[in-house]
Amino acid sequence: MSCDLLVGSTGFVGGNLLAKHTFAAACHSSDITAQYGTRPDLCVYAGVPAAMFLANADPEADLAVMRAARENIRQIAPKRLVLISSIAVLADSRGAYEDSPARNTEGLPAYGKNRLQLERWVREDFPDALIVRLPALYGTGIRKNFLFDLHTITPAMLRPEKYSELAAKSPLVKSAYTLADNGFYKLNGT
């Protein structure tokens, strides 16, 4: 009997995968340790956050998330692995394919650089892993990206400077956002 595991089941990509395929097990950051040592036949790891602006705002915290992802994968010890990554690991994705090497990383933002580091660690630990580099996404359940921002009037997060500017002009803005642990102001209820 085949056993497959989805990590990142509550995120955009993971949630869509879960909606289309019945995995033997699915988990996310709060319950991933229950999967340690299970050695599934296949692990689809979609558990890396895709909030580019947060990664670039705090590169070290984002790299710590990549280290934790590597450790999670090692502890799960799957026989086969699919890592969901990002095309942002390429400085210039024009004409590139998923297996295109990331040659020039100079000037690459932390988001891409840190995901590239995770890809390299995965290659060290699981040489036969399939790494899928997704482009900008759009669809049901998306909570961020350029296209989402175009049709969503109220932003889910504000930088501190923008919050201060808007809150000074509007009591509604002042009461609608709360300072989050990541230093951004988050829209209440999101």
Where are these regions (language model features)?
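NAD(P)H-binding glycine-rich loop region in Rossmannoid oxidoreductase-like domains
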Residues: 33-78, 87-96
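NAD(P)-dependent short-chain dehydrogenase/reductase
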Residues: 124-190
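N-terminal Rossmann NAD(P)H-binding glycine-rich loop of SDR-like oxidoreductase domains
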Residues: 2-23
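Active-site Tyr-X1-5-Lys
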Residues: 106-130, 135
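Conserved glycine-rich Rossmann-like NAD(P)H-binding loop of the short-chain dehydrogenase/reductase
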Residues: 22-33, 38
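Short, well-ordered alpha-helices that flank and scaffold nucleotide-derived cofactor binding pockets
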Residues: 19-23, 71-74, 120-124, 152
